[in-house]
UniProtKB/Swiss-Prot annotation:
Keywords: Coiled coil, SH3 domain. GO terms for molecular function: phospholipid binding. Residues 287-315, 350-369 are annotated as: Disordered. The lineage of its organism: Eukaryota, Metazoa, Spiralia, Lophotrochozoa, Platyhelminthes. This is Antigen EM13.
Amino acid sequence: MIQERADIEKAYASNLRKFAARLEMFLRTGVEYGTATNILSGLAKEAEDNAELHSNIAAGLINPVQLGIKNWQRENFHKSSISTSIKEVKNFDSEFENAQKTWYKHYKNVNRCKKEYFHACKTVRSLQVQVQNAKNEPFGTPEQLRKIEDKLRKGIMEEEKTRKAYEEALSSLSDVTPRYIEDMTQVFNKAQAFERERIIYFKEQALQMQEVLDISAKPNLSQIFVGLRETVAKVDADADLKKWSLAYGVDMAPNFPVFQEYSPEMSALGKKGRSALADGSSGGVTLTSLKTITSPDRGGPIPGTTDSGSNISTSPVHTTAYGSNSYDHGSEGATPSDYTSSVNGAAAAISKEKQRVEDTPPYPDFVDDGRPGVPIRALYDYVGVEADELSFNSGDLFEKLEDEDEQGWCKGRKDGRVGLYPRQLR
C-alpha cells in the first residue's frame, strides 16, 4: 500500500519534470519574447519545484515509513523455516489448543452420551407405538405381543442407562470448565496484548505517513507559488511592445538604401568570403593593402593586381605585399626586367593559389557537420538571393548554428541544408 502511494508520487513528479522540460524547449524556440518569457520560465520552475517536493514525499514514504514497518515486522513476525506460516500465529494456535485440550475431551464425551440417549428415547417411543398397535390388532397373536413388550422393557432400561451416562458426562464437563475458562482467558489476553501492540504501531506509522503526505505543512510550498506570482508579475506588456518596435517596428533606426559605387576588389570580402583560403588557420595569404601602381611600360596608373582567393597586391618597383612581409626593391632606377620579374613571381603565386581554391568546395563553411543548433522561428518571408543563402516562409522552424557576423548574417540549418540568413529574419 505504501509502495503503491510512493509510486504515484514518483509518477507525478516525473510528469511534472517532463512538463517543465517541454516549457523550456518551447521557450528556446523564441516564439515568446521579452518579459513575457517570465510566464514560461515561472511555470517551468514551479513544475520543477513541485516535482522535487513530491519526489521528497515519495522518498519519505519509503524511508522511514515503509522501512520502519518492514523492520517491525521482521522483529515481531517470524516465518517458519519449514512452512510459510508465521511462528507467532502458530504459537498462539498451539496455546489455545493446549488450554482447551482437557475440556474438549469431556465435551466430545458429552456429545457422544447425548447422541446415545436421544437414540434410546427414540427407540422406546417407537416400541410403545408398536405395542399399542399390537393390542388393537384383531389378527395378532399373544406371542407377537409378548415379543414387542420384551423389546419395550429393554428399551426403557437402555434409555435409563444412557440418560445416566449423559448426566455424568455433563457433570464431568462442568468440573473442568472453570480451569478451561482460566486457561483460555490467559492465552486470549496474551493474544490481545500482541494485537494491541500491532494496532498502536500501525497507528503511529499512519500518523507519520500523514505528516509526509501533508504538503500544506511543507515550508517551501508557499514559496513556490509566491515565487511564481512574483515572476509572472514582472511581465510588462508596454516594455515588450516598445522593445519590439525599436527592433522591428516604426521606432527602429532607419536604414534605407543609398547609392554605393561598385568595387570589384571588395566584392570577395563580404559575407561570402568564407573559404578555407580566407580562413586564418588555412595558411593562405591575406590582403594587406590596395595600391595604385605605375607600369614603366605604360607610364600611367593601373590597378593593383588582386585575387579574391589569395588577396595579394603587387607593385612593380615599390613594394610587394605577400602575407605580412614587405620587400623594398627601391623606387629609383628600376628597370623593366625588375618589374617583369616581380609581377611574374606574384602571378605564379596567384595562379597556384587559384588552382588550390578551385579544388575545394564552393562554400566549405556550409557543409553540415551534424552539430546541434538552437531552434528558432522565422518572423518574415525571405527568399535567398545567392546559392549559400537559405529561404524561409513566415512561421518556419529552423536551427541557428552561429551568431551574426559583422555583416549582419547568421549561419543556420533548414531541412538538412546549411546556409546564411539575415538577422532580422528571426
